[in-house]
């Protein structure tokens, strides 16, 4: 019996040792897996971050270049068209000088006054031209709604359809911008 007890004790001890070893192995495997997770955190994708940072930098540079270009163009336009307001105010003076020059007289005094008016008009027109003001050609030209304002349309045997036959008020451009369209009569 004693042998049986000893065998049972041995078996129990062996079983206990095997269980302890198994638990130790299980714990050790779990610890290793956890240790691996702790020791090797998910490596950040530095290449992707670098590529994203470079792309962001390129976008910012492009945005800044566009900003500088827009500001430069706006500054150029402000300088180019800075005289537009005063030119618009001076154009009625040119019209009035043209009307004054249409007066016909045999009187010598009136003729000398008209000569003076002609000189003033010529000087004013030269000054406007130096500022970039250009008279829009009208009579005999094809009607262009960007340059001309049709006031009258009449059938004409002398002109083709869509051709300006008369000008009621001169039109002007400042550089490439229309500041006043020509008021015209157009052939149908």
From Swiss-Prot:
Main localisation: cytoplasm
Cell location: Cytoplasm
| Chain spans, region Disordered | 1-26
Which NCBIfam families does this entry report, sorted A to Z? PRK14140.1
Gene this chain is encoded by: grpE
The job of this chain, per UniProt, is described as: Participates actively in the response to hyperosmotic and heat shock by preventing the aggregation of stress-denatured proteins, in association with DnaK and GrpE. It is the nucleotide exchange factor for DnaK and may function as a thermosensor. Unfolded proteins bind initially to DnaJ; upon interaction with the DnaJ-bound protein, DnaK hydrolyzes its bound ATP, resulting in the formation of a stable complex. GrpE releases ADP from DnaK; ATP binding to DnaK triggers the release of the substrate protein, thus completing the reaction cycle.
Quaternary structure and partners = Homodimer.
Q: Which family does it belong to?
A: Belongs to the GrpE family.
Q: Which GO terms describe its cellular component?
A: cytoplasm
SUPFAM superfamilies reported in the protein's UniProt record = Coiled-coil domain of nucleotide exchange factor GrpE (SSF58014), Head domain of nucleotide exchange factor GrpE (SSF51064)
Any one Gene Ontology molecular-function term assigned to this protein's record? protein-folding chaperone binding
Q: Which terms does the UniProt entry file under GO BP?
A: protein folding
Q: Low complexity bias located where?
A: 1-22
Q: Which CDD domains match?
A: GrpE
Q: What is this protein called?
A: Protein GrpE
Q: Which InterPro entries match?
A: GrpE (IPR000740), GrpE_coiled_coil (IPR013805), GrpE_head (IPR009012)
What organism is this sequence from?
Exiguobacterium sibiricum (strain DSM 17290 / CCUG 55495 / CIP 109462 / JCM 13490 / 255-15)
Q: Keywords assigned by UniProt?
A: Chaperone, Cytoplasm, Stress response
């Amino acid at each position: 019996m004693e042998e049986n007890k000893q065998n049972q004790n041995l078996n129990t001890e062996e079983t206990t040792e095997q269980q302890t070893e198994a638990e130790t192995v299980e714990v050790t495997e779990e610890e290793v897996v956890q240790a691996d997770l702790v020791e090797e955190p998910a490596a950040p994708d530095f290449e992707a971050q670098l590529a994203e940072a470079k792309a962001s930098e390129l976008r910012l540079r492009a945005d800044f270049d566009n900003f500088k270009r827009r500001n430069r163009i706006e500054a150029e336009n402000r300088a180019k068209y800075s005289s537009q307001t005063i030119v618009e105010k001076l154009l009625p003076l040119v019209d009035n000088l043209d009307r004054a020059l249409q007066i016909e007289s045999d009187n010598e005094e009136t003729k000398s006054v008209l000569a003076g008016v002609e000189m003033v008009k010529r000087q004013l027109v030269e000054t406007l031209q130096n500022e970039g003001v250009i008279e829009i050609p009208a009579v005999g030209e094809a009607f262009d709604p960007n340059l001309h304002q049709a006031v009258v349309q009449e059938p004409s045997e002398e002109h083709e359809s869509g051709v300006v036959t008369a000008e009621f008020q001169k039109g002007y451009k400042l550089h490439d911008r229309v500041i006043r369209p020509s008021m015209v009569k157009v052939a149908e």
